[in-house]
Amino acid sequence: AAKRQKRAHQTRLLLVVFLAMLLVAGSLAYCEFWLWRPPGEGPAGPKVPRSAFDRPWSTRPVLLVGLGDSITAGFGVSESHGYFGRLAENPKDEWPDMKGICLREVLPKFGTLNLAVSGSTSLEHVEHISKRLEKQDPTVFGIVVMTTGGNDLIHSYGRSPPKEGAMYGATLKTAAPWIEAFEKRLDRMIGMIQDRFPGGCHLFLGDIYDPTDGVGDGEGAGLPPWPDGLKILDRYNGVIHAASSRRPGVSVVPIRAAFLGHGIHCAQFWREHYRSEDPTYWYGTNLEDPNARGYDAIRRLFLIEMVKVKDAM
């Protein structure tokens, strides 16, 4: 009887140890795949062709103008490490593969003007362009970069009923007239920008990224559920992408596609957009804006689109 009791005690002890190990392993796995979002180290984003920066693009005076929201304003990083700053010139600690790849290297008569405002919506961007972007001399060519519309969607994070300019939580039906208004507003903004540059300009318009990596679960980032969120995001991006066909001199920068797999599900290898070559998080702590590596990637995406049209500058 004593031996049976001893064996039973040992069995129970082994079972407790096994269950404890299982619990620890499960907890670690949960943290690994659901909570930990490694930002990674080193350069991020696609390669930019160095050969495109071997000779000047233009001898004209060129003004790089930034418009829109906090992504273009560079929220969360130093001025030199936002995508606008990196477009203009390389920071002192530039990655080796990007040294010498910036606009100042290929535009000898080059200036910058960043009018982007953190937290602003597309409704405010119309006002900013109207009141703050002055008409330029006919000798000046404009390279204009803009991110707009993202704050229209994510504000006010479900803390108040959805409305135009703060649509979080809206149904697609409710948002339909707001999307239509955004299309008209964007067309108006493009027209105003082009009017400000009688000597010509090219607008590079970033589309809107999706921190949920195509899953649509804002609650995974601590936000309320939004069943129609991805549908509305797709409609907004559809408006942005259509802009390049509605007007000449407009290029869309595919930020959303590049950032899929670098959002809140970046560590989950079973997801459709998992990036095995770089399963890291490119967003800041506020979810709205990129982190330093995200800004690096955006800079590269804009430069790639600029290279495609450099001969027209």
Which role fits each region the language model picked out?
Residues 77-184:
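Conserved SGNH/GDSL esterase-like catalytic core that processes O-acyl groups on lipids
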Residues 1-67, 71-91, 104-106, 139, ...:
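N-terminal secretory targeting modules
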Residues 126, 179, 183, 187, ...:
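Short, amphipathic alpha-helical "lid/cap" segments that border enzyme active or binding sites
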Residues 208-313:
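Catalytic His-Asp segment of secreted/periplasmic serine-dependent ester chemistry enzymes
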Residues 63-67, 72-74, 111-116, 142-147, ...:
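Structural recognition of the beta-strand scaffold that forms the well-ordered cores
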Residues 46-65, 125-144, 188-199, 303:
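Short amphipathic alpha-helices and their capping/turn segments at secondary-structure boundaries
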Residues 73, 155-177, 210-234:
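Serine-dependent acyl-ester chemistry module
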Residues 98-111, 185-202, 235-254, 305:
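A structural motif corresponding to the C-terminal end of an alpha-helix
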